[in-house]
Swiss-Prot record:
Coiled coil (UniProt feature): 62-97
Membrane topology: Single-pass membrane protein
Transmembrane segments: 3-23
Basic and acidic residues: bias regions: 65-87
Keywords: Cell membrane, Coiled coil, Membrane, Transmembrane, Transmembrane helix
Region (Disordered): 25-87
Encoding gene, per UniProt annotation: yqfB
Knockout consequences: No visible phenotype, no effects on FloA or FloT membrane rafts.
Protein name, per record: Membrane protein YqfB
């Protein structure tokens, strides 16, 4: 029993189980309170709907004009966003082209330096093993 209480994994598991149990209860209470609040909002909104139905016939042309304005505004915003995206895409393409050109730039000095370093370091040990290892492999 003492070993169980000193093991941190078991203690963490017990704490997790307890918190899960209490967490479920609090979630259920929140859901119940939200369900109770919703019907109250529906009742208070119904008189407003009745009033708006009486006023509704007059502003129909205004609604259409407003909808048209909103659609036009969304179209303009979409066009602005599209132009911005096109600029970003063009900049990204130019950047990739620039990096490719930069990677492919090879001048005489870098080629000579690469050849010299290749000769200095020589072939890898796997291709040219040490002398002491050759007899051991043959056996």
């Amino acid at each position: 029993m003492e070993d169980l209480l000193t093991n941190p994994l078991i203690i963490a598991a017990i704490i997790g189980i307890i918190s899960a149990i209490f967490g479920k209860k609090s979630k259920e209470e929140k859901q119940n309170s939200q369900k109770r609040k919703k019907p109250q909002h529906v009742q208070s909104a119904s008189p407003q709907k009745k009033q708006s139905k009486e006023d509704a016939p007059a502003p129909i042309p205004n609604r259409m004009e407003q909808a048209r304005r909103e659609a036009e505004e969304r179209r303009r915003e979409t066009a602005r966003n599209l132009k911005g995206l096109e600029r970003d895409l063009a900049a990204a393409k130019q950047k990739t082209v620039y990096t490719k050109q930069k990677m492919l730039q090879v001048n005489k000095d870098t080629v000579v330096q690469g050849i010299v370093l290749g000769e200095v370091f020589g072939p890898p040990r796997a291709k040219k093993p040490h002398r002491t290892m050759r007899p051991a492999r043959k056996n």
